[in-house]
Design a protein with these regions (language model features):
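Active-site loop segments of alpha/beta catalytic cores
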Residues: 2-181
Length: 181
């Protein structure tokens, strides 16, 4: 797996070029919006739009490598905060374009970000609240600026200790509740 920010300095993080949101094919977004509108106006279906960008925590694990990202969460909070700021800066541009088009025609939006193992969250609830929650909450609030849809969040693992925080962030539907987690 390509991990472009593994071991990156703060300067390298700041210089990293995220994909250009202007390169998104507007015709594809328009096609999604047209189909959502058609279903919304002609059926009694519950219409879901998959969130157009990956979860912020998982993205960190993918871009840095799992161990490197968790190490940074424990030892380099400045880097982690800057990472999440940069991710949200990019994601907000995509969110605005996508939900401006499809937002009026959906009943819920589905997002995923795995926060836990089978037994417990990847990080302590306190660390989650300090490092992840503010950005996760901001992302959900920003999404809801463009749609009245309910917000479904998927996380594998035992997120039991984070449920109140997820609700506080704006999660209205939690998937899944793992019976053995």
């Amino acid at each position: 797996m390509n991990t472009p920010l593994k071991g990156a300095t703060l300067e390298e993080l700041n210089a990293y070029r995220f994909p250009d949101p202007d390169s998104i094919d507007e015709r594809q977004i328009a096609a999604h919006a047209a189909r959502a509108k058609e279903l919304y106006e002609t059926t009694d279906y519950v219409i879901c739009a998959e969130h157009p960008v990956y979860g912020i925590f998982e993205l960190g694990c993918w871009m840095c490598g799992f161990e490197d990202f968790l190490y940074r969460m424990a030892l380099d909070e400045e880097w982690i905060h800057r990472f999440f700021e940069r991710v949200l800066e990019y994601q907000k541009k995509v969110i605005q374009r996508y939900y401006t088009a499809v937002g009026p025609y959906i009943h819920y939006t589905s997002s995923g970000d795995d926060f836990a193992t089978q037994n417990a969250p990847f990080v302590s609830p306190d660390m989650f609240r300090e490092l992840v929650k503010p950005y996760f909450k901001e992302r959900i609030a920003y999404t809801k600026r463009f749609t009245k849809a309910k917000y479904l969040h998927h996380s594998c693992g035992s997120v039991y200790r984070l449920i109140d925080d997820l609700v506080d962030c704006g999660v209205e539907i939690l998937n899944p509740i793992q019976p053995k987690a």
